C-alpha cells in the first residue's frame, strides 16, 4: 500500500472528526442505558452502537460488543440490497434480528438500523442493537436448547421497517405484542434503541451544518484510509507464514458431540487471510453461527491484539480476507438454528484466532509486537434463564447476566483479569445483585471468585466467578442452561496451563430456609441436599423453593511455566483465597507450612522433582535436533518459553529459553523436538484442584504437555481430542 501523504492540518481535522463521530456512537449507548429499563442493558451492557457511511461501510463504533461488528455491517448491506433508493426515506428505521439475513448473533439480539439524511440525501446509517429478554419461539428467554431449526427459535425480522417517516408501524408493533412473551418490556427496549438512533441523526446533522457535507465525506474516507495504512504496517511486523489450529464446539443441545472448527491464518504482505476450510458441516442444534457473526467474533482478537491503538473502521476490514465455507457451523444456512451459536461456536472462533495471532506475534522481530501475545480468555457465556409465573400469574424471565464473569487470559507481563467476561464482549458488566433481586423473584446467597479456576502459569489466568440463588416470593419456576467450555478447557500459552471449565449444580431439597429463618446466609459447604450436576445444555429444569441453583464459571489460560512464578506471589494468591494449598503445591511447586509460610528448601526440591517427573513421564521426541547449542548465537526471544539462535551459516534454530536446548530448525515444527505427555483433561487439571467435566464416551479431551528434553521446562500446553 502506498503511504498516504497528508498535511498536518488535515490529519488534525480528521482526528477531530473521528473523535466527534466516536462520541456520537458512545452517546447512543448512554441513551440506551438510561432509557431501556432492563438490567441486561443498563447493568450487563449487552448492546452495541455503530455509525456507517451511506454505502454501509463502518465509520465508527462504540466498542461495547466487538463481535457485533460483523452483524452491523451485514445488516445495513442487506437493507441496501433489498430496498431501492426510493424506498429508503427520511424518518425510517428498520428492525432486524434474523441471523440468516441480517446476520444477528442470535435472535434475541434485536437491531434498529436507521438511515440518516441531510437535505434529503442519504449520507450515513446508525445501528443500535441490544439483547431483548424474549423473542418468542419454543423457549422463554431466546436460548432454544431443543430447537432443530430456525423456525422454532423466534419471531425473526429480516430488516423490515418498524418506523416509517417518523411513526411506529402499528402492524409490526402488534406482531411483536402477540408473539413475544414480555411485550411491554420488549417494546420499551426497542423504543430506547430507536431513540439512540434518532439522537445520532440529530448530532450528525449538527456536525454537517458546522463543517459541510463535502468535508464530512472527505474526512470519513480519510480516516478509513489512515486506519487501513496503519493496520497494514502492523501486519508487516509479523512473519510471512501460515499458522493452523483447531478448536471444538461442544454439545449442540441434542447430543454431547464435539464439533471441529479449523482455521488457517496466512500472513501476507500487509494482509491477513483466515481460512476456515476443514470446519464441520452445520448441525441441527443451536450452536451454528451466521457468516457475519463469525466475522465479528474473528475480528475481536484482531482488534485487541493488533489494532488496539488503531481506530476501528472499514479500513481495518480492507486488509483481511475471510474464507468461510457455506453450510458449516461458521457460515450456516437456513434452516440451521443459531440461538447459542455466538456463545459457543463464535467464542471458539475467538479463542482459536487469539492463539494463532499470538503465535504469529511471538515470532515477530518487534519486541513490542511480541509483548501483546496472550493466553485465551475462558470465552464462554454460561447462560441461565429462570422463568415462570409470579403469585399474580404474570410471567417473569430472568436472563442472568452474571454469565459474564469468566476469567481472562494471562498476558506477557501480568495475570489475566478476574471476572473479565468474554473476549468478544469486553464492555459487558456484571449486574448489580440488588438490582436483579429488585427486578426478578430470586435471592442471591453469594457471588465470589471461583477458587482454582485460572490456568496455572508464570502469569496466572484470571479467575471466574461462582454464585448461587434461590427462588424468592414465587412457587418456583424452570431453568434453562447453556454453557460452552464445559469439557474443552481454554488453552494457555508459552507453557501455561488451560483454565478450568464452567457448569451448573442444583442442590435439591436443601436446608437453605433453616438458615434464612435464623437470619443467616449459608455458604456452599453448609448446604445439605441432593447435589445434581446439570448438562451443559438443558431446557426447563424445575427449580423448587427449597432448591439452590449454583453456577460456576471457569478461568482464562495461563502464560509461562508455573514453576517460574515467584513463590511469594503464589503465597499471596493462597492468602487471598485465589488458590488452594493443593494448587500451590501441585501446579506451582510451592510448599506452604501449617503457619502459612513458604518452606524454601522444600519448594526448591519440589520444583526440581516436578521437572524430573515431567522428563520421566514424557514420551521421547519424534525428532532430535543434532546441533550444539554452544555454537549458536542468540538472536531473539520467541515468547516466554522459546528463543531463536543462529549458527555461523545463518541457519536459525528454536531453542528452550531456560537451558537453550535446540529443538528444531526454524522452518520445522519445534514440537517434534520436545517430549510429550498426553493426559485426559479432567485428570491433568484435576490434580491441581481444577474442575473439567469428563466425557463419558469418545472422543475424549486431552491436555498435551510439551516438555524441554534438556531441563524439563514446560514449553507449550495444547489440547486435543482422540479415542484413547
Question: PLM features: residue spans?
Answer:
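Glycine/proline-enriched, intrinsically flexible loops and inter-domain linkers
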Residues: 2-90, 95-118, 122-620
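Fe(II)/2-oxoglutarate
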Residues: 615-642, 654-656, 660-663
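Short Cys/His-rich Zn2+-coordinating modules
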Residues: 631-651, 684-695
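Extended intrinsically disordered, low-complexity coil regions enriched in Ser, Thr, Gly, Ala
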Residues: 649-685, 719-724
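Flanking scaffold residues of small Cys/His-coordinated metal-binding clusters
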Residues: 650-651, 700-703
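Short, cysteine/histidine-rich loop/knuckle motifs that typically chelate Zn2+
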Residues: 657-658, 708-710
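Acidic, low-complexity intrinsically disordered segments
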Residues: 715-716
Amino acid at each position: 500500500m502506498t503511504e498516504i501523504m497528508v498535511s498536518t492540518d488535515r490529519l488534525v481535522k480528521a482526528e477531530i472528526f473521528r473523535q466527534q463521530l466516536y462520541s456520537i456512537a458512545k452517546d447512543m449507548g448512554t441513551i440506551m442505558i438510561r432509557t431501556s429499563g432492563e438490567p441486561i442493558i443498563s447493568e450487563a451492557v449487552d448492546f452495541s452502537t455503530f455509525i456507517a457511511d451511506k454505502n454501509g461501510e463502518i465509520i465508527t463504533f462504540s466498542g461495547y460488543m466487538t463481535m457485533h461488528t460483523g452483524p452491523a455491517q451485514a445488516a445495513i448491506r442487506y437493507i441496501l440490497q433489498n430496498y431501492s433508493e426510493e424506498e429508503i426515506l427520511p424518518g425510517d428505521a428498520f428492525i432486524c434480528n434474523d441471523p440468516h439475513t441480517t446476520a444477528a448473533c442470535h435472535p434475541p439480539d434485536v437491531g434498529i438500523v436507521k438511515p440518516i439524511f441531510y437535505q434529503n440525501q442519504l449520507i450515513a446509517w446508525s445501528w443500535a442493537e441490544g439483547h431483548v429478554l424474549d423473542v418468542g419461539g419454543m423457549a422463554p428467554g431466546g436460548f432454544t436448547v431443543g430447537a432443530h431449526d430456525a423456525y422454532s427459535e423466534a419471531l425473526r425480522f429480516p430488516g423490515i421497517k418498524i418506523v416509517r417517516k417518523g411513526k411506529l408501524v402499528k402492524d409490526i408493533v402488534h406482531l411483536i405484542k402477540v408473539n413475544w412473551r414480555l411485550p411491554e418490556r420488549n417494546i420499551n427496549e426497542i423504543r430506547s434503541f430507536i431513540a439512540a438512533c434518532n439522537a445520532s441523526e440529530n448530532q450528525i446533522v449538527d456536525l454537517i451544518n458546522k463543517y459541510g457535507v463535502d468535508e464530512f465525506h472527505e474526512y470519513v474516507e480519510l480516516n478509513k484510509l489512515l486506519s487501513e495504512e496503519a493496520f497494514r504496517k502492523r501486519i508487516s511486523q509479523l512473519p510471512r507464514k501460515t499458522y493452523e489450529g483447531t478448536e471444538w464446539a461442544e454439545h449442540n443441545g441434542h447430543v454431547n458431540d464435539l464439533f471441529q472448527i479449523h482455521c488457517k491464518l496466512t500472513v501476507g504482505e500487509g494482509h491477513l487471510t483466515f481460512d476456515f476450510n476443514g470446519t464441520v458441516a452445520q448441525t441441527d442444534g443451536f450452536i451454528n453461527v451466521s457468516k457475519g457473526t463469525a466475522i465479528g467474533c474473528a475480528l475481536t482478537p484482531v482488534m485487541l491484539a493488533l489494532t488496539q491503538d488503531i481506530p476501528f473502521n472499514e479500513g481495518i476490514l480492507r486488509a483481511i480476507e475471510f474464507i468461510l465455507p457455506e453450510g458449516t457451523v461458521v457460515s450456516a444456512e437456513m434452516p440451521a438454528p443459531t440461538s447459542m451459536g455466538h456463545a459457543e461456536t463464535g467464542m471458539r472462533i475467538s479463542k482459536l484466532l487469539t492463539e494463532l495471532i499470538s503465535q504469529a506475534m511471538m515470532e515477530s522481530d518487534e519486541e513490542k509486537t511480541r509483548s501483546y501475545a496472550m493466553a485465551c480468555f475462558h470465552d464462554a457465556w454460561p447462560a441461565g434463564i429462570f422463568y415462570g409465573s409470579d403469585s399474580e400469574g404474570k410471567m417473569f424471565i430472568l436472563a442472568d447476566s452474571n454469565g459474564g464473569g469468566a476469567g481472562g487470559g494471562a498476558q506477557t507481563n501480568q495475570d489475566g483479569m478476574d471476572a473479565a467476561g468474554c473476549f468478544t464482549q469486553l464492555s459487558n458488566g456484571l449486574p448489580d445483585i440488588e438490582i436483579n433481586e429488585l427486578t426478578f423473584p430470586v435471592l442471591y446467597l453469594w457471588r465470589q471468585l471461583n477458587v482454582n479456576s485460572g490456568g496455572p502459569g508464570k502469569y496466572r489466568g484470571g479467575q471466574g466467578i461462582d454464585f448461587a440463588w434461590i427462588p424468592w416470593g414465587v412457587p418456583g419456576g424452570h431453568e434453562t442452561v447453556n454453557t460452552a467450555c464445559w469439557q474443552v478447557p481454554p488453552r494457555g500459552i508459552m507453557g501455561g496451563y488451560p483454565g478450568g471449565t464452567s457448569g451448573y449444580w442444583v442442590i435439591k431439597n436443601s436446608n437453605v430456609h433453616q438458615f434464612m429463618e435464623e437470619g443467616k446466609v449459608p455458604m456452599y459447604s453448609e448446604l445439605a441436599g441432593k447435589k445434581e450436576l446439570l448438562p451443559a445444555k438443558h431446557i426447563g429444569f424445575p427449580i423448587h423453593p427449597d432448591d439452590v441453583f449454583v453456577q460456576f464459571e471457569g478461568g482464562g489460560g495461563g502464560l509461562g511455566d508455573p514453576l517460574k512464578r515467584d513463590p511469594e506471589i503464589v503465597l499471596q494468591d493462597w492468602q487471598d483465597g485465589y488458590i488452594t494449598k493443593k494448587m500451590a503445591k501441585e501446579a506451582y511447586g510451592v510448599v506452604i507450612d501449617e503457619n502459612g509460610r513458604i518452606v524454601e528448601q522444600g519448594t526448591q526440591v519440589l520444583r526440581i522433582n516436578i521437572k524430573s517427573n515431567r522428563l520421566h513421564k514424557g514420551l521421547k521426541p519424534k525428532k532430535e535436533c543434532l546441533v550444539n547449542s554452544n555454537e549458536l548465537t542468540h538472536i531473539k526471544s520467541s515468547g516466554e518459553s522459546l528463543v531463536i539462535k543462529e549458527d555461523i551459516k545463518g541457519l536459525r534454530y528454536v531453542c528452550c529459553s531456560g537451558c537453550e536446548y535446540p529443538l528444531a530448525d526454524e522452518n520445522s515444527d519445534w514440537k517434534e523436538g520436545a517430549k510429550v505427555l498426553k493426559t485426559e483433561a479432567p485428570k491433568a487439571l484435576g490434580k491441581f484442584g481444577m474442575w473439567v467435566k469428563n466425557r463419558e464416551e469418545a472422543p475424549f479431551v486431552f491436555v498435551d504437555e510439551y516438555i524441554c528434553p534438556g531441563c524439563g521446562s514446560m514449553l507449550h500446553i495444547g489440547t486435543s481430542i482422540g479415542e484413547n
